[in-house]
Amino acid sequence: MSANYWTSSQRLHWLLTKETLAERRKGLEDIFDPGKLQTIKALNPWHVRVYLHTLIHLLGQNLSIRQRILATAEVYLTRFHTKVPFGEINPYLVVATAVYVACKVEEHPQHIRTITSEARSLWPDYISHDPTKIAECEFYLIEELGTYLVIFHPYKSLMQISDAMARSNAQITMAPEEIQVTWSMINDSYITDLHLLNPPHIVAMACIYMTVVLRSHIMRMTMPSEAVKSRIEAFMTFFGESNVDLEQTIDCVQEMISLYVNWDTYSEKQCRVEIAKVIT
């Protein structure tokens, strides 16, 4: 197990470029017949990702599983679907399996019968009472992930960067509610491809940027506009001196904005019906 991100399998084996990711996904289309491919392409990929995110969190909530474990499961799911196209295998089974494996890797194991029972109670039409189905899917999942299962998350980077901000300039000290908002954005970032394309600290910085700069209009309700402007300038000075890649960070911000724009048009009920057409 690597002690840090820079020597980890996450960086050495699972840090992709946008071009590589697009090529992989394009290649996956070849396995489907034209009819099914047309049905899959009719799905809004953002809505599918949001739906899978809600499935993971619903199962996690029912099992009282910590957010970090669910984040690990989401990374597994995103990686898996760069190797296996959505629609080839029961997504509800893959979700349950990803959570099961993540619990073991993050040293908070759940019994396979517990996972099976809870998943079946949520999705009885798609989950068998037989726990060996998850066991079989576990081997498939781990094989497609290349057995690289240790995940580094942006949560630690968030706290490190916020501490550095406070030391650099008291004016840009993040308030507890700002930390919470940024933490929630990081949770949402797992719906995207950001964790395949960027180191954790880039994702953390992008979410901090969105909180401090893009949500500054909220601060204007309690602070004079000049004070808000001065704070943003101080943050941008910190950002410039931090040596964090600006272009990568802005790309992340744009991806997060795209997520939220598409999330506004998301209907869980409609997405569930459309996904059922693909997997039946």
Swiss-Prot record:
SMART domains assigned: CYCLIN
GO biological process per UniProt: cellular response to heat; meiotic cell cycle; negative regulation of transcription by RNA polymerase II; positive regulation of transcription by galactose; positive regulation of transcription by RNA polymerase II
Similarity annotation: Belongs to the cyclin family. Cyclin C subfamily.
GO CC term, one of those recorded: CKM complex
Signal peptide annotation: none
GO molecular function: cyclin-dependent protein serine/threonine kinase regulator activity; RNA polymerase II core promoter sequence-specific DNA binding
Lineage: Eukaryota, Fungi, Dikarya, Ascomycota, Saccharomycotina
Organism: Yarrowia lipolytica (strain CLIB 122 / E 150)
Keyword Nucleus: yes
Name of the protein in question: RNA polymerase II holoenzyme cyclin-like subunit
Subunit structure, as described in the record: Component of the SRB8-11 complex, a regulatory module of the Mediator complex.
Compartments where located: Nucleus
Domain of life (superkingdom): Eukaryota
InterPro entries: Cyclin-like_dom (IPR013763), Cyclin-like_sf (IPR036915), Cyclin/Ssn8 (IPR043198), Cyclin_N (IPR006671)
Cyclin N-terminal domain segment(s): 23-150
